[in-house]
């Protein structure tokens, strides 16, 4: 079994507030190309954390690819309460993350800050690599995950950056 974590910018972090934004189709083209590359190299699990934005678009692409490739999808939420306060439109996206092959809630609810690092450590230990939409020119809290990932020997990182997207458009 080979599992790849998929994570990246949330839609608000890159100023995309409408699913019909033309940038979404460019991002999804890049996702499709990269996910096919993973599948053709033996990856059989895509792991998500259930966030809006990049993960949402990658989940849509992964579900489309299930028609062509034997792949499994998992969502490992940080908390059971993840997305509880989202609006109705976003609740529909949350239901898509819950309708995958495997769903796990790492913690019942928030209790202390160390839960975040424990969660990311778990994700790193259960996956062989990560596909991350991230650019050091536009930092977010993902920088902490990426630092841990880069410190792990043999952990494979594929970054989708703004430069790569510009090359594709």
UniProtKB/Swiss-Prot annotation:
Natural source organism: Streptococcus pyogenes serotype M49 (strain NZ131)
Protein origin, superkingdom: Bacteria
Cross-referenced HAMAP family: UPF0398
Gene3D superfamilies per record: 3.40.50.450
NCBIfam families, A to Z: PRK13660.1
Protein name: UPF0398 protein Spy49_1277c
Family named by the database record: Belongs to the UPF0398 family.
InterPro entries linked: YspA
